[in-house]
Swiss-Prot record:
Residues 1-58 form the HTH lacI-type domain. The lineage of its organism: Bacteria, Pseudomonadati, Pseudomonadota, Gammaproteobacteria, Enterobacterales. It comes from Escherichia coli (strain K12). This is Catabolite repressor/activator. Keywords: Activator, DNA-binding, Repressor, Transcription, Transcription regulation. InterPro entries: Fruct_sucro_rep, HTH_LacI, Lambda_DNA-bd_dom_sf, Peripla_BP/Lac1_sug-bd_dom, Peripla_BP_I.
């Protein structure tokens, strides 16, 4: 089936059908009703654009690179899943690479994707803000879009969580619990995302007289958090309140506590970035903030596709998407 037939069956012009199928409906203000008419015909007839032919005409490969720091992080994998599905619907292939939160790995991943001649790259960077690696593309038309962790906003477009605001909101909720000892567990303080989450926490806690212990793991991996927390427990009692800046860090704490005590204390108040419905089975109060994965993926892909459309190339800058707050553990049953 050809594009002309899709347009005829949907009752729209060939140009409008092309905008919808190639992900440019919003750019050209095609109504949601028209988009649904076209996509209904596409689904009914299992239509797939000829990506090779389109790529040859446009000098493109119809492929997009994605570099994420951790394939075991469910937040990243959910975003990747939405990105892949939406990109495929628009005739693009998503090539996924993992940096393991190592700067050298990330730079190699980027170089390999460039060798594959991808049309654009989406990256959640593990590089500190002052690192010069991405500056070579600062004035280059090649689209690089930052996901979750921002790049230089003067030259790149970034879609991130509202890290500082989300951390402040989460810490404000945690403050309501009558805990005497508080532990803040983060990782990689040199990353902007880590800095912003700590700033949000400190803002919420600035007028609270309770002492907070700050710990930073050398990675956002579960094992790194477990090792750090286990060593900390050698000289400190179990905290009564815990704030973790990622779900993997919380898992590391839980691993150590369950191995040592067989269960989590019922009076341990937990606040964490990242969410999982299984937290509802815990017998302690849990506060969790989670990204709106579909919204993040849609916005990122919208920016990527707009970046490939020269007349409508978006300006550099930062888009923040606030997370949702969930009450888990015993809070889900009250």
């Amino acid at each position: 089936m050809k594009l002309d037939e899709i347009a005829r069956l949907a009752g729209v012009s060939r140009t409008t059908a092309s905008y919808v199928i190639n992900g440019k409906a919003k750019q050209y203000r095609v109504s949601d009703k028209t988009v649904e008419k076209v996509m209904a015909v596409v689904r009914e007839h299992n239509y797939h654009p000829n990506a090779v032919a389109a790529g040859l005409r446009a000098g493109r490969t119809r492929s997009i690179g994605l570099v994420i720091p951790d394939l075991e992080n469910t937040s990243y994998t959910r975003i990747a899943n939405y990105l892949e599905r939406q990109a495929r619907q628009r005739g693009y292939q998503l090539l996924i690479a993992c940096s393991e939160d190592q700067p050298d790995n990330e730079m190699r991943c980027i170089e390999h994707l460039l060798q594959r001649q991808v049309d654009a790259i989406i990256v959640s960077t593990s590089l500190p803000p002052e690192h010069p690696f991405y500056q070579r593309w600062a004035n280059d038309p090649f689209p690089i879009v930052a996901l979750d962790r921002a790049l230089d906003r003067e030259h790149f477009t970034s879609v991130v969580g509202a890290d500082q605001d989300d951390a402040e909101m989460l810490a404000e909720e945690l403050r309501k619990f009558p805990a005497e000892t508080v532990l803040y567990l983060g990782a990689l303080p040199e990353l902007s995302v880590s800095f912003l989450r700590e700033q949000g926490f400190r803002t919420a806690w600035k007028d609270d007289p309770r002492e907070v212990h700050f710990l930073y793991a050398n990675s956002y991996e579960r094992e790194a958090a477990a090792q750090l927390f286990e060593k900390w427990l050698e000289t400190h009692p179990m905290p009564q309140a815990l704030f973790t800046t990622s779900f993997a860090l919380l898992q590391g704490v839980m691993d150590v506590t369950l191995r040592r005590d067989g269960k989590l204390p019922s009076d341990l108040a937990i606040a964490t970035f990242g969410d999982n419905e299984l937290l509802d089975f815990l017998q302690c109060p849990v506060l969790a903030v989670a990204q709106r994965h579909r919204d993040v993926a849609e916005r990122v892909l919208e920016i990527v596709l707009a970046s490939l459309d020269e007349p409508r190339k978006p300006k550099p800058g930062l888009t923040r998407i606030k997370r949702n707050l969930y009450r888990r553990g015993v809070l889900s049953r009250s």
